[in-house]
């Protein structure tokens, strides 16, 4: 094949399957194996109704994705027409696309926790008070409504073909599946420093004030380290999973749509000048400060920790306090 033909081949989009379709059997097998592990070592890690809800979330998300896939593809191809360059299907382009797509996911994921409109869709993934591989299946039914796909459009505008972007996005999703487990504690420090791991992602699913809105990474934890959103798992503080205001129900439709219902109620009842705030400000925001956001919860916790620390120091320095013996 001549040089011109090779160059043309690199520019022609290949037929790429959805890698997630091929990973589903492995997902099922790993969930089964984790269930066996939990039955022997930690029976409380799985709750039948919770697991069934997670499976229903996954099924519904698949159906919703199939319904909206055509519209997302059409918009992606339309944006691709106005690309700044044409990036070939070369080995280096695949690596660049994978890394940049993971950064786009970080931006999306961080936004999904900081803007209530996007949180209304993403909250589905955090609604379980258990943390196991079935939790990974809790994907949104309303991602298209929330416009989450917009965060990948800049890659196509830059010149990556939509087929490449969707394929590496599938790989990203596959990677994130296995980190939803408590069966694995920690990896070697070099791996924990670069990659997202079960330990890092457990932090992300926590409701503890120390951990709220941290570790947004998909594959590479370096984004959190770079942008100040990384927090390590602390062994002496057990993680509490779920959302700040727990649902207290396994009702599937309520689990899927409860935050959208909450937005509608708040927008309807809010003063005119504050209506948009209930869609675009952080979850928990109110115009009168009557509810907590993750920031106010963390600030109150930090103040409490500082007070405990100062009280402890004052007690140790007080006259008559027992001083520790020198080594």
Report residues per predicted region.
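Cytosolic/stromal cytosol-facing helical appendages immediately following the last transmembrane segment
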Residues: 130-134, 181-327
């Amino acid at each position: 094949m001549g040089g011109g033909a090779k160059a043309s081949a690199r520019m022609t989009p290949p037929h790429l399957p959805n890698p997630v379709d091929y990973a589903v059997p492995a997902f099922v097998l790993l969930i089964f194996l984790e269930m066996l592990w939990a039955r022997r070592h930690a029976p409380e890690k799985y709750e039948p109704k919770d697991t069934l809800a997670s499976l229903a979330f996954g099924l519904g998300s698949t159906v919703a994705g199939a319904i909206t896939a055509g519209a997302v593809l059409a918009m992606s191809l339309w944006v691709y027409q106005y690309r700044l360059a044409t990036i070939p299907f070369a080995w280096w382009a695949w690596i660049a696309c994978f890394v940049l797509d993971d950064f786009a996911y970080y931006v999306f994921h961080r936004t999904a926790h900081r803007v209530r409109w996007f949180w209304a869709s993403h909250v589905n993934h955090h609604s379980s008070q258990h943390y196991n591989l079935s939790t990974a299946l809790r994907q949104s039914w309303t991602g298209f409504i929330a416009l989450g796909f917009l965060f990948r459009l800049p890659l196509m505008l830059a010149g990556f073909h939509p087929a490449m972007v969707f394929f590496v996005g599938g790989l990203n999703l596959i990677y994130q599946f296995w980190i939803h487990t408590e069966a694995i504690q920690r990896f070697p420090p070099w791996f924990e420093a670069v990659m997202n791991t079960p330990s890092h992602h457990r932090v992300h699913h926590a409701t503890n004030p120390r951990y709220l809105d941290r570790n947004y990474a998909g594959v590479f934890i370096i984004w959190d380290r770079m942008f100040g959103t990384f927090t390590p798992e602390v062994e002496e503080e057990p993680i509490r999973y779920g959302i700040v205001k727990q649902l207290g129900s396994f009702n599937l439709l309520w689990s899927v749509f409860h935050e959208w219902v909450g937005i509608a109620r708040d927008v309807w009842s809010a003063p005119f000048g504050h209506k948009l705030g209930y869609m675009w400000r952080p979850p928990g925001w109110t115009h009168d400060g009557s509810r907590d956001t993750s920031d106010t919860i963390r600030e109150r916790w930090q103040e409490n920790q500082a007070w405990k620390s100062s009280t402890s120091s004052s007690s140790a320095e007080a006259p008559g306090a027992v001083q520790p013996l020198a080594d």
